[in-house]
Amino acid sequence: MKYLMYLCLKELKINKLTMKRQMIITLALALTMTMPTFAKKAMTKKEIAEKEKAFKNLQHPWKGKKVAYFGDSITDPNIKASKVKYWGFLEEWLGITPYVYGVSGRQWNDIPRQADKLKKEHGDNFDAILIFMGTNDYNNGVPIGDWYTETFDSVRVARHKPSEMVLRRHRHFAMDKNTLKGRINIAMSKLKQMYPTKQIVVMTPVHRAYFASSDKNIQPDEMYENARGLFFDEYVKAIKEVGNVWAVPVIDLNSLSGLFPIYDAGAQMFNKMDTDRLHPNDAGHARMAKTVMQQLSALPCNF
């Protein structure tokens, strides 16, 4: 019995020593990790003042720039659904000079015309282009199409041996004016060659719901397929792909803006609850503008 008590006391003593040793090691590691903090010299008042000044001098990279806006009715200054458009808020908040070319009802095939008008009126004297287009391509049942066509062509290659001619698949941009992707290719090809050094930003169309301006212009909400049997999100998806196909930033307003007129609760951001859930009102445009402003803060306006 005494022997058993002796063994228990001995084991307890060993456990206490082990715990003590672990605590010492842990404390030593903690001190080692915090030593650089203790050793770091505190900033002087002058250094603090300089950092505060630098922080105050930070400004939005698009502040005071000249920006061209291509688009449809949501960009068109003549549409009365809102007194101030998203580009008007950006002008107010960032001092951006807007060159607006959006026209109601236009589709992606109108971008080349808008680009020509910009060139004629301002030449190269601007900083960037924002494109906000696509909702009318959906409404008019434009086929989605393909980004590329393919051929089999001979090309010379050399890889660790003398060069030789081989037959390989060869992609070409599909320039079909009757499809969405073809129209985008035509537009972006023109812009990339016309303005190779300019920042070009594409924005996805926002969600859309019921619109009726007359007996001859009634547009169901996006939960219905269009005349082509395609849903709205298929057009949005294609426009999002432009970023990788043409090396341009894409601002996904369809998701980021939060505008959702499908439900009555979201219709307050649009022109008329009963007849126009297609065009955002002032509140809707302000929300879009805030989203665009934040997204643009991460992008250079000039190169």
Give, region by region, the residue ranges found by the protein language model.
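Sec/Tat signal peptide C-region and signal peptidase I cleavage site
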Residues: 35-39
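Short hydrophobic targeting helices and cationic amphipathic motifs
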Residues: 4-9
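Serine-esterase "nucleophile elbow" of acetyl-processing enzymes
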Residues: 40-104, 109-125, 129, 264-265
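Short hydrophobic "helix-edge" motifs at membrane interfaces and signal-peptide entry regions
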Residues: 26, 62-63, 270-272
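Alpha-helical cap/lid subdomain in secreted, periplasmic
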Residues: 93, 115-303
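Positively charged n-region of N-terminal signal peptides that target proteins for export
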Residues: 2-3, 15-22
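Bacterial N-terminal signal peptides
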Residues: 26-34
